[in-house]
């Protein structure tokens, strides 16, 4: 293959006409290579090389990330290379070409032409420009400065290209020689636009060298346009610099306090035309100055500011540095759009890849949302409450993973996803900068700098849509997450009979499940308790208070008395599904959702206003209403007896559309059981992952072993006047009135016989003073 060298390239580099690849991407020949050692770090290897354009020779320094090319023999004397990234800088009076990235066009070739050392360039001021390797000179302070400069990541070895599954929107994946300029920015700079995997840092900035203006008479002001350099060329050694980039993300302005005082801070992320990303941080007065000026999606010219090592615990961008702006920094908006700078850049990994990734890694992932849970409120260790919403994401790798949204994501993107799923649409979701965690399997969670894109318009999303419509709906997926968490803990759909059959709650940790059931009965003799209203931070104390007898209430925890107490729900409910019934307890938030009225208002209706009719009407509306109950099931010790207690942590009205999809999904998983999408249970009790368990085995017969179960719920001495009527149900259906099988108590022929006043009669109550709907006796409200 015949390769021509770029004529005159060395002369232009020596004269300062060409300082970076933005001005020219020359093809040169390496005529000599020599290994040198840095004086301050002898263990660090560097290679100095001599470059030729066929006429002149010039010294260059190879980036340390390219040392392997020399060691492998890919780069050697005689090799012809294309300098895809370089910086020409003056060190101790000599202009040195620092090459952090190059492309080897030909490994070995005869020396082309008869190159000689170049003449003295403008900046040299009479210094000798002869090409020779001098050990003393190589270890001088000037070279030491170069040796300190080391790109943070490996560059492309022979042919730069975007690695892995990374993508940008839009982005080119092949080199191009198209030049571009942005007239509105006032810089008039042309550069080559090609996409490649960029290094994180570059040693020196290509600034107009001051000596070029020497001997030209007095100059009052330098009116030269700013020299724009790539983001990845920035380093702590950069002096005057200007970058042109798009804001891809902006954090909120936050207040902070430390031993040095209080302050405020915000940051934003930048992306330039070469795919370089960097974070910019502003503090205090600088934050006030620039916060309103920065808008996500806009283009800016940013100059001045200091570079410091990136704090990788908080900064996920692929750059070893971040910018800190100060009072001397300038930000100028570019009002004319530059299509060469993408709006977003992704480095997608498949869900299958996540399985082998480490905990706390930051990942970009894209997939189809197959299901989503409602928003729940989680109380953190510091007492603050935060919303949480979970969804399942699947892709073409045959794997699915739980994605957990926190904070504002739940109400914005989360609500939109919920609406799409409820309407029968399976949207595409792209997650940028999600954090991997290993709690209950692999999960992906949002962090402060995460971004969510619903049905985005780029190639990966279109491929996923086509795959899902073509075959993805019926393809089984293995979940990397153990269970689908919808209420802050491991949360799976179960039947009431499974609570007893599977002995849920008896392990060291509680079980968190969802049960779709109907409220059969409510106990209302003590439906609320008096609570402390004193605020503890942003939450009320809510501990029980006692009446002092003088119109005040005392809280032992707060050690204070208050003039007025609060009232909070503590409801005892009996719920039933198609397999069994049980007792549960619902506290304040869940109680208000069920009753539709606050505990205080209901207390006043019953005890202050004595409005029995209104009270009964409220109760009547609640009875025989179906909900999705999210339960915490845990065994507790009461009076030296072990008892399993179920507490309602969240209650949602039944969404028939979503529930139908859940049923259909469960049926699909049953059909694809052989593909390991679900664990196979020969006893027919595999309701995990939203699979409905009817108690019928694969042979079509009921499993007699499922009839055996232990007692659950309240004991007789705690169950009101009639004791505990709730025997286990399991796979068989039996009547609680006559004890026979084949029908439920609500349809029992014996239930029509007159009973004692207020006795439970299989779904309705009948008293000697007459019967009425709603499942509660008029004279015995609050007793079983």
Swiss-Prot record:
Keywords: DNA damage, DNA recombination, DNA repair, DNA replication, DNA-binding, Metal-binding, Nucleus, Zinc, Zinc-finger
Biased segments, Gly residues type: 760-776
Record-level Gene Ontology MF annotations: DNA binding; zinc ion binding
Ranges of the DNA-binding region feature: 241-327
Keyword Metal-binding: yes
Biased composition, class Polar residues, residue ranges: 132-148, 167-190, 695-707
Pfam families: Rep-A_N (PF04057), Rep_fac-A_C (PF08646), REPA_OB_2 (PF16900), tRNA_anti-codon (PF01336)
ZnF (C4-type) intervals: 532-558
Region described as Disordered: 114-224, 678-707, 746-784
InterPro entries: Euk_RPA1_DBD_C, NA-bd_OB-fold, NA-bd_OB_tRNA, Rep_factor-A_C, Rep_factor-A_N, REPA_OB_2, Rfa1, Znf_CCHC
Localization, UniProt: Nucleus
Subunit structure and binding partners: Heterotrimer of RPA1, RPA2 and RPA3 (canonical replication protein A complex).
Function: Component of the replication protein A complex (RPA) required for DNA recombination, repair and replication. The activity of RPA is mediated by single-stranded DNA binding and protein interactions. Probably involved in repair of double-strand DNA breaks (DSBs) induced by genotoxic stresses.
NCBIfam families: rpa1
Family under the similarity heading: Belongs to the replication factor A protein 1 family.
Protein name: Replication protein A 70 kDa DNA-binding subunit E
Provenance organism: Arabidopsis thaliana (Mouse-ear cress)
Gene behind the chain: RPA1E
């Amino acid at each position: 293959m015949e390769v021509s060298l770029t004529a005159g390239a060395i002369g232009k580099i020596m004269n300062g006409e060409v300082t970076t690849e933005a001005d020219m991407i020359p093809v040169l020949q390496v005529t000599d290579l020599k290994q040198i050692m840095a004086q301050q770090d002898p263990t660090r290897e560097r290679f100095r090389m001599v470059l030729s354009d066929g006429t002149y020779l010039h010294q260059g320094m190879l980036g340390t990330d390219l040392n392997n090319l020399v060691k492998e023999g890919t780069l050697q004397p005689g090799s012809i290379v294309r300098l895809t990234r370089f910086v020409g800088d003056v060190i101790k009076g000599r202009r040195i070409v620092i090459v952090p990235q190059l492309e080897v066009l030909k490994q070995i070739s005869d020396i082309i032409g008869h190159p000689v050392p170049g003449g003295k360039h403008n900046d040299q001021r009479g210094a000798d420009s002869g090409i020779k390797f001098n050990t003393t000179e190589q270890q001088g302070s000037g070279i030491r400065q170069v040796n300190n400069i080391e790109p943070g990541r490996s560059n492309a070895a022979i042919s730069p290209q975007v690695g892995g599954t990374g993508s940008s929107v839009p982005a080119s994946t092949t080199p191009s020689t198209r030049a571009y300029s942005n007239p509105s920015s006032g810089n008039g700079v042309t550069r080559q636009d090609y996409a490649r995997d960029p290094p994180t840092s570059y040693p020196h900035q290509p600034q107009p060298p001051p000596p070029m203006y020497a001997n030209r008479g007095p100059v009052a002001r330098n009116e030269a346009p700013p020299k724009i350099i790539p983001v990845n060329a920035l380093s702590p050694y950069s002096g005057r610099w200007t970058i042109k980039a798009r804001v891809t993300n902006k954090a909120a302005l936050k207040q902070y306090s430390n031993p040095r005082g209080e302050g405020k801070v915000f940051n934003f992320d930048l992306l330039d035309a070469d795919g370089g990303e960097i974070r910019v941080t502003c503090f205090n007065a600088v934050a006030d100055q620039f916060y309103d000026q920065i808008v996500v999606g806009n283009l800016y010219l940013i100059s001045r500011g200091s570079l410091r090592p990136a704090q990788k615990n908080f900064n996920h961008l692929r750059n070893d540095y971040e910018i800190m702006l100060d009072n001397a920094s300038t930000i100028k908006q570019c009002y004319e759009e530059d299509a060469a700078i993408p709006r977003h850049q992704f480095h997608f990994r498949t869900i299958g890849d996540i399985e082998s990734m480490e905990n706390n890694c930051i990942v970009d992932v894209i997939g189809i949302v197959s299901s989503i849970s409602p928003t729940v409120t989680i109380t953190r260790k510091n007492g603050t409450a935060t919303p949480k919403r979970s969804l399942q994401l699947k892709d073409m790798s045959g794997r699915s993973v739980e994605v957990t949204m926190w904070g504002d994501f739940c109400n914005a993107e989360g609500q939109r996803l919920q609406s799409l799923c409820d309407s029968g649409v399976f949207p595409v979701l792209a997650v940028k900068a999600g954090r991997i965690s290993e709690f209950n399997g692999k999960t992906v969670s949002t962090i402060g700098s995460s971004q969510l894109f619903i049905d985005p318009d780029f190639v990966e999303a279109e491929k996923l849509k086509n795959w899902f419509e073509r075959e993805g709906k019926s393809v089984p997926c293995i979940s990397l997450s153990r269970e689908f968490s919808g209420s802050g803990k491991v949360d799976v759909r179960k039947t009431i009979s499974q609570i007893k059959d599977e002995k849920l709650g008896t392990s060291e940790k509680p079980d968190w499940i969802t049960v779709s059931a109907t409220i059969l009965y409510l106990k209302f003799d003590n439906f609320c308790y008096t609570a402390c209203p004193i605020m503890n931070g942003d939450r009320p104390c809510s501990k029980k208070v006692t009446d002092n007898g003088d119109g005040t209430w005392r809280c032992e925890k707060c050690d204070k008395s208050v003039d007025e107490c609060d009232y909070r729900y503590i409801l005892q409910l009996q719920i039933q599904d198609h397999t069994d019934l049980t007792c549960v307890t619902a506290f304040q938030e869940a109680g208000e959702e069920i009753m539709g009225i606050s505990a205080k208002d209901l207390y006043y209706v019953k005890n202050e206003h004595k409005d029995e009719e209104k009270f009964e009407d409220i109760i009547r509306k609640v009875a025989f209403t179906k909900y999705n109950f999210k339960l915490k099931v845990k065994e507790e010790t009461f009076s030296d007896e072990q008892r399993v207690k179920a507490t309602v942590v969240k209650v949602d009205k039944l969404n028939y559309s979503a529930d139908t999809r859940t049923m259909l999904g469960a049926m699909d998983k049953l059909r694809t059981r052989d593909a390991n999408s679900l664990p196979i249970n020969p006893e027919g009790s595999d309701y995990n992952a939203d699979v409905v368990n009817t108690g019928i085995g694969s042979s079509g017969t009921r499993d007699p072993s499922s009839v055996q179960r232990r007692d659950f719920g309240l004991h007789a001495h705690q169950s009101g006047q009639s004791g505990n009527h709730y025997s286990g149900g399991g796979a068989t259906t039996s009547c609680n009135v006559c004890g026979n099988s084949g029908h439920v108590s609500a349809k029992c022929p014996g239930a029509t016989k007159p009973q004692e006043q207020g006795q439970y009669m299989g779904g309705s109550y009948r008293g000697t003073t007459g019967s009425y709907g709603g499942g509660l006796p008029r004279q015995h409200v609050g007793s079983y």
